[in-house]
Each structure stands twice: as structure tokens, then as C-alpha cells.
Amino acid sequence: MTSRGWRLGAVVVLAAICAAGPERQEVIRTASDLGPLPADRYDYTPQDYQRSQRASALLIRQCMAEHGHPDFPLDPRYPGNTVVATAVSTDYGVLDLAAARRWGYGWDPEKRVALRPKGRRMTNAEYADFPACSAEASRRLMHGIDLKRDWLYASTRALEVDKAVKRDPRLRAALDAWSRCVAEQGFTRYPDPVAAYTDTAWQRGGDGNTRHTQRERATAVADVTCKRRHHTAELWHAARAQKQAVDITRHRDRYAAGLQALRTYRATIAEVLRKLG
């Protein structure tokens, strides 16, 4: 879709939501339910992350074998105990009402267990050589990419784009309506859903999870309920689509170079997986 198409589409979404009033809309439970954004094609994806982790592990194992560690595992644990941090938030805060009722602004602690390394613990000798092999794997995966200029250019622009999004009068009105709604249910009047999600009152632990207190869960339920009532996530998403489309048009060459860098990276990963995987 062209940038102009994105802008027109976002305007249509904004107008449709505003005109629809309180009638029932499609329930939004995850950010993906809102649809793609213009900058998505220029950015790193969860699949990229999974494939890069696999490719990196294969390269590290190869390097470690060259350093005298022939049985180094693909998914090793560190010599000491480490904390695995889990991140499950979205740009729009919590969206799933069922999850809010049960976990508040946190998540099922069993998810953390699933992220723990499956391999054996590294020996001290392996751990001594691991950093150099990890750095070498990164260099190989990033070969041919200008890291300072081109790598994940869309991500470097995201901060400026989000500043423009927050200045959008329609979004500011939407966030104000959401804020009033949450306060009217007896909770803190947060300026936006991100402030609610990151409230220190939830006492996140070292892994990022919260304590799931009754107050936290009740606040999260009010948060999601008010988002649905006022179509906060939809309006926010539409505003982001508009601003991203404008930014892509203004910096077309840089975005194109960033996309080419991402394609180079993906091709390198595919080659590593083909040869070693």
C-alpha cells in the first residue's frame, strides 16, 4: 500500500470509529488484531529474532569447537544463576481482558520457565571463550551492513515518529477520554496506558513480572474496559499509521537502505542455517 493509501486509510478508520459511537466493535485482544503498520515491513520481526538466535547459536557452537570445546550445547546455561526477563506488553499497554483479570499488568509466571535455556550449564573454561565466540557470530551475521547508518533505520525513527503521534490532537483527546474513564472507576488518573502499565505500585520483580495484587488486576481491568469503550487502541493505531506513512515518504531513501540491510541480514541467516542447521 502506498503512503498516500495509508494516510487515507487511517483517516477512514478514525472517521468510522468516531461515527460508530457506542455500538459494538470487533474486540481487540492483541496488537496484531489492529492490523499492520506502514513501518512494519522495514523492521525486525519475531521470526527474524528466532532465526537469528538459531543461526547465532550454530555459529557460536562452531567457534567453540575451534577453541577446543567440541560438545558445546546450542542452548547453554551460564555458570551462575541468571534471571530471564520476560516482556509481553504492547505499544498500547494491556489489551486482553481475560489476562488483565488474572494477571493484571504481569503475566503467567510459567512463561518464564519456557524461556530458560534447555542445554547444560557452561563450564568455566567454556565461559571464558564464550564472549569472543558470541562477538564473532554477531560480526558474521552483520557482515555487509552499515550498522550506524542503515541497520534498523525504522527503529531509530520510531522515537521521533511517536513524538509526532503523541502531538496528534485526535489521539490526545482519545487518551484524555481513556484517562477520565479509568479515574471514574476509582483508579489513578494516568496520562496514558503506558503509565498505567509501568506504575511502580505493581512492584515488578527482577524478571519484570508483577505481584498480581487485587488492586493491580482491578486497575488493569478498568484500563482494558475503558480502551474498548473509547476505541483507544484503534485510534492510537490509526494515528501511528498516518505519522509513519508521512515519515517514510520524507525519508524514503533511508528507509529503503534500511530495508536492504535487513534483507542482507536475512540472507546471511538463511545461508548459515542452510550450512550449519
Regions found by a protein language model. Give the residues of each.
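Cell-envelope/extracellular polymer assembly enzymes that use nucleotide-activated donors
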Residues: 20-277
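Secretory targeting and sorting signals
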Residues: 1-24
